[in-house]
């Protein structure tokens, strides 16, 4: 979903003639993220120069960033999350990548998915970086603002994406248990399959029964160049509706398996 939502914005901001070098966390999420971004950027006309896997929790990414300098790429895509993203982005900036001009283009770094907490960890390095996120406290819909108000009253600061996700998931689980009339996992699963809801801050949302994928609106964001506080780190560039990021359930294949084992 990150690729589908981010692709048009990358085309608008950086153009169609780009060469991308991917550094990808070597596990399922990283592989999927890389595949999504490659699919949509290559459809724009971007060339994928290289796609290099990095160990989860590598810490020091210098041996992976150094080859980027001589690769001919003018975009570095960091398919990393959490501390890996903070470390790889920080080190890429320290290597001076954002100061370079390659192929007549100013070098760019893209982080397909990140949160405000990750942005805090990256500090000034996140400024101007494009990516996507699941939710942001600055959204103006009624559900988001109600949560922001109550969270702020309790904790004295705006909620993070992680806080909103945990809150929503807890409500959804409680509702599924109530609907199923039991805590027995197979019945709770059935209550969630195909469940549609709204008002939580992510637009009209559905847990698709066929593959258990949660489809919702996606936010394209950019690191704020002039934040007013430690919580004002992301600018919302575009709210991409769920309809633009959905894909057929057969695309990735596989079976979910039986309800009971």
Question: What are these model-derived regions, one by one?
Answer:
Residues 1-95, 137-146:
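Extracellular/periplasmic Venus flytrap/periplasmic-binding protein
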Residues 82, 137-195:
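Extracellular/periplasmic ligand-binding modules, especially the Venus flytrap/periplasmic-binding
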Residues 127, 196-261:
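Solvent-exposed, acidic/polar segments of extracytosolic/periplasmic ligand-binding ectodomains
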Residues 18-23, 99-101, 158-164, 185-187, ...:
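Surface-exposed patches in mature extracellular/periplasmic domains of secreted proteins
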């Amino acid at each position: 979903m990150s690729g589908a939502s981010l692709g048009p914005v990358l085309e608008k901001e950086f153009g169609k003639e780009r060469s991308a070098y991917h550094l990808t966390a070597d596990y399922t999420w990283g592989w999927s993220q890389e595949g999504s971004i490659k699919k949509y950027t290559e459809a724009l006309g971007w060339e994928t120069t290289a796609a290099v896997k990095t160990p989860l929790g590598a810490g020091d990414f210098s041996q992976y960033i150094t080859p980027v300098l001589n690769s001919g790429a003018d975009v570095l895509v960091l398919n990393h999350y959490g501390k890996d993203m903070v470390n790889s982005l920080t080190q890429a900036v320290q290597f001076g990548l954002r100061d370079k001009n390659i192929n007549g283009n100013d070098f760019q770094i893209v982080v397909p998915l990140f949160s405000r907490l990750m942005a805090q960890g990256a500090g000034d390095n996140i400024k101007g970086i494009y990516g996507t996120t699941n939710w942001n406290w600055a959204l103006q819909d009624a559900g988001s603002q109600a949560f922001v108000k109550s969270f702020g009253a309790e904790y004295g600061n705006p909620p993070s994406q992680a806080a909103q996700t945990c809150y929503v998931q807890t409500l959804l689980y409680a509702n599924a248990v109530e609907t199923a009339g039991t805590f027995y996992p197979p019945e709770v699963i059935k209550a969630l399959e195909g469940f549609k809801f709204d008002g939580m801050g992510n637009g009209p949302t559905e847990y698709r029964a066929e593959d258990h994928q949660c489809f919702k609106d996606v936010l394209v964001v950019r690191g704020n160049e002039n934040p007013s506080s430690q919580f004002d780190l992301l600018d919302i560039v575009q709210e991409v509706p769920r309809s633009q990021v959905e894909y057929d359930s057969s695309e990735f294949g596989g079976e979910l398996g039986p309800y009971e084992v």
